[in-house]
């Protein structure tokens, strides 16, 4: 029997909430206390890590692990590594030399509170902690997965093209390149890490990676649309900032209506491919649907 939209929403929200609680508890254990020296650096690290957020990437890691019948709590090492990596990217993305944003998750960005130097080091620290946690899994392939997602063929490569495209008229191919690398690569890694740590077969790992890349791109398309349609209060960051900065976004290239259609199509195709895999795909499909219906 199919669930109603309201039932689905509650199911997804409850799963994400429970995942967030698990990840937050683990992050508090893995990160140094604010009182530990150097205190200013650790305050900056925890300031951004515990500023809120959906914890979508670690939730996808947990969901992928469970879908592949993984057992045990070691998956929390990877889940926390993903959230640390994501937070590192946000801290650096907000810097004056990058996107120059003043607000993130409803409060001043890291560099506005601690200064640029400490913010850079806080981001660096989170990235180092992420790889330290992955090393504790004893699975070198997991370290390689995250490294590929972040490197010049991943997030960093996408960020470079994003910066170089500001204020320029670019086509859909360029926008796809930016966001397949800058955003989707890390979401893809979230799914792959869960499958790897569950001991999944290569077919499932590759399929979950492809699913992650497609829903990751859909996530970014929705983000671009929300930047134009939502308020600063709802987003927790400056609404309309992408348009103001001349960023390469989907609405700027194909319009809002076509952007929404693209996001839905990506998710629908991702779900169809997911159902071909020998895994329990239920919660992953619901999270994919949530990506296109979220309002912040």
Residues covered by each model-derived region:
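N-terminal amphipathic/basic leader segments beginning at the initiator methionine
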Residues: 1-31
């Amino acid at each position: 029997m199919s669930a109603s939209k309201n039932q689905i929403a509650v199911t997804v929200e409850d799963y994400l909430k429970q995942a967030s609680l698990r990840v937050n508890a683990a992050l508090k254990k893995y990160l140094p206390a604010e009182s530990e020296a150097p205190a200013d650096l650790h305050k900056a690290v925890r300031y951004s890590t515990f500023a809120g957020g959906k914890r979508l990437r670690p939730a996808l890691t947990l969901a992928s692990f469970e879908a592949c019948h993984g057992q045990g709590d070691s998956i929390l090492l990877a889940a926390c590594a993903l959230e640390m990596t994501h937070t590192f990217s946000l801290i650096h993305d907000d810097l004056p030399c990058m996107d120059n944003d003043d607000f993130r998750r409803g409060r001043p960005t890291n560099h506005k509170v601690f200064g640029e130097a400490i913010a850079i080091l806080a981001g660096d620290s989170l990235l180092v902690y992420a790889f330290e946690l992955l090393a504790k899994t004893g699975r070198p392939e997991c370290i390689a997965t995250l490294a590929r997602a972040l490197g010049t063929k991943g997030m960093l490569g996408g960020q470079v093209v994003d910066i170089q495209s500001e204020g320029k008229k670019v086509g859909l191919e360029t926008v796809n390149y930016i966001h397949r690398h800058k955003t989707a690569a890390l979401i893809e890694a979230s799914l792959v890490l869960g499958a790897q740590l569950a001991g999944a077969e290569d077919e499932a790992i590759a399929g979950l990676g492809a699913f992650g890349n497609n829903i990751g791109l859909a996530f970014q398309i929705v983000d671009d649309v929300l930047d134009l349609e939502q308020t600063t209060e709802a987003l927790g960051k400056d609404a309309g900032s992408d348009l103001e900065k001349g960023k390469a976004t989907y609405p700027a290239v194909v319009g809002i209506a076509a952007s929404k259609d693209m996001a839905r199509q990506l998710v629908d195709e991702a779900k169809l491919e997911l159902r071909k895999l020998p895994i329990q795909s239920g919660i992953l499909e619901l999270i994919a649907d949530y990506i296109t219906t979220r309002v912040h």
